From Swiss-Prot:
It comes from Halalkalibacterium halodurans (strain ATCC BAA-125 / DSM 18197 / FERM 7344 / JCM 9153 / C-125) (Bacillus halodurans). Its main location: membrane. This is ATP synthase gamma chain. GO terms for biological process: proton motive force-driven plasma membrane ATP synthesis. It is a peripheral membrane protein. Produces ATP from ADP in the presence of a proton gradient across the membrane. The gamma chain is believed to be important in regulating ATPase activity and the flow of protons through the CF(0) complex. It comes from the Bacteria. Coiled coil: none annotated. Belongs to the ATPase gamma chain family. InterPro entries: ATP_synth_F1_ATPase_gsu, ATP_synth_F1_gsu, ATP_synth_F1_gsu_CS. Keywords: ATP synthesis, Cell membrane, CF(1), Hydrogen ion transport, Ion transport, Membrane, Transport. PANTHER family: ATP SYNTHASE GAMMA CHAIN, ATP SYNTHASE SUBUNIT GAMMA, MITOCHONDRIAL. The lineage of its organism: Bacteria, Bacillati, Bacillota, Bacilli, Bacillales.
């Protein structure tokens, strides 16, 4: 049975841990609010570009672009967004598990796909399994700007344009609510799902639709990567906030249990002392 000193040390240690997890929960909540605001403010930009592209694609003019056309798939590119740090519950593991399942189901060899890893945790897990990582990016800030990922986003789009890849997907955790984040696979290229986009305005283009399309499509594809990153950041902070909240609750329960054990042990020790005193007094009579 643990001594009173041991139990007291465990109580103090758990209280310190609780202070840390509570602080991390509050920090994550603040970062979540900022990330949500940033992700929401970026949506109108991507929505408007998508509307313009859809308007051109649906027009009667004879315009075309490789990014709008499907071709036989020989190689697939995957952009995988995870976090640099842990303590976020199953945020990273669920995504990597889903990605590996899809890759094993979709491809027969490593020559059929390549991975762009954003985030240290995912990169390390994928490297451990010796998967083909073409490019990686770690150390992004909690509130990343487009310039932070411009190079890797442009690289993925350029490799599709150069037909290194015939299709490009992005994997990330989509923010649903502070307690729910969904592993999501979104097709970035080719853009074949524009028909369901509502076009609310009639546009006139200068110099012509083809020139506008060639300028907008790469920007739109790159913006999809950045938008997914902002969404993933919000999901990361939500997952970490939830994980730290659960850890704080567990610490509270453990402190209650240890305090009860301490009081019982202390009561038993006092009872034992009284018994010994009474027994000693009786022996002297």
């Amino acid at each position: 049975m643990a001594s009173l000193r041991d139990i007291k040390q465990r109580i103090n240690s758990t209280k310190k841990t609780k202070q840390i997890t509570k602080a991390m929960e509050m920090v994550s909540a603040a970062k979540l609010n900022r990330s949500q605001e940033k992700a929401q403010s970026f949506l109108p930009y991507t929505d408007k570009i998508r509307e313009v592209v859809a308007s051109i694609a649906a027009s009667d003019t004879d315009v075309s672009h490789p990014m709008l056309e499907e071709r036989p798939v020989k190689k697939t590119g995957y952009i995988v967004i995870t976090s640099d740090r842990g303590l976020a519950g199953a945020y990273n593991s669920n995504l990597i598990r889903g990605l590996l399942y899809t890759i094993n189901k979709r491809h027969k060899s490593k020559d059929e796909y390549g991975i762009f890893a954003i985030g240290r945790t995912g990169r390390d897990l994928l490297k451990k399994r010796q998967l083909p990582i073409i490019s990686e990016m770690t150390g992004l800030s909690d509130q990343p700007t487009f310039n932070d990922i411009k190079d890797i986003a442009k690289q993925t789009v350029d490799m599709f344009a150069d037909e290194v890849f015939d299709e490009l997907y992005i994997w990330y955790n989509h923010f649903v609510s502070p307690i729910k984040q969904d592993v999501t696979e979104k097709k970035v290229l080719p853009l074949t799902d524009l028909s369901d986009t509502k076009v609310s305005t009639t546009y006139e283009y200068e110099p012509n639709e083809q020139v506008i399309l060639e300028a907008l499509l790469p920007q739109y594809a790159e913006s999809l990567v950045y938008g997914a990153l902002l969404d993933a950041k919000a999901s990361e902070f939500a997952a970490r906030m939830t994980a730290m909240s659960a850890a704080t609750d567990n610490a509270t329960n453990l402190i209650d249990e240890l305090t009860l054990s301490y009081n019982r042990a202390r009561q038993a020790a006092i009872t034992q002392e009284i018994t010994e005193i009474v027994g000693g007094a009786a022996a002297l009579e």
